[in-house]
Regions:
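Short, charged recognition helix plus adjacent turn
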Residues: 3, 74-91
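Short, highly charge-biased, low-complexity peptide segments
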Residues: 64-78
Length: 91
């Protein structure tokens, strides 16, 4: 019997993110070389990201900015009102 998890592991998230990025790039008809020239991210970094999901945060943010997706990162580590209320209980 296999054990299944409803949560993803980081490597899964990386690969899914890379796949979605590649799809967006292709939909916009932008080559990897063009993207490297416009973003300041090296061609090697872009290729590695699309193949393995590995990229520095700075490079990922540059690429997101180029495709007007930088705001997608706003929700990461955002503390919502419920968490602030809970934190007050323990302070």
């Amino acid at each position: 019997m296999k054990n299944y998890s409803l949560t993803k592991v980081p490597s899964q998230v990386q690969l899914e993110l890379a796949s979605r990025f590649r799809e967006i790039r292709r939909d916009k008809k932008v080559s990897q070389s063009q993207l490297a020239n416009k973003s300041g991210v090296s061609l090697g970094s872009i290729k590695r990201f699309e193949q393995t999901g590995q990229i520095s945060l700075e490079s990922l943010l540059k690429l997101a900015h180029l495709f007007d997706r930088l705001s997608d990162f706003d929700a990461i580590f955002k503390i919502d009102a419920d968490l602030k209320s809970i934190a007050k209980l323990f302070s």
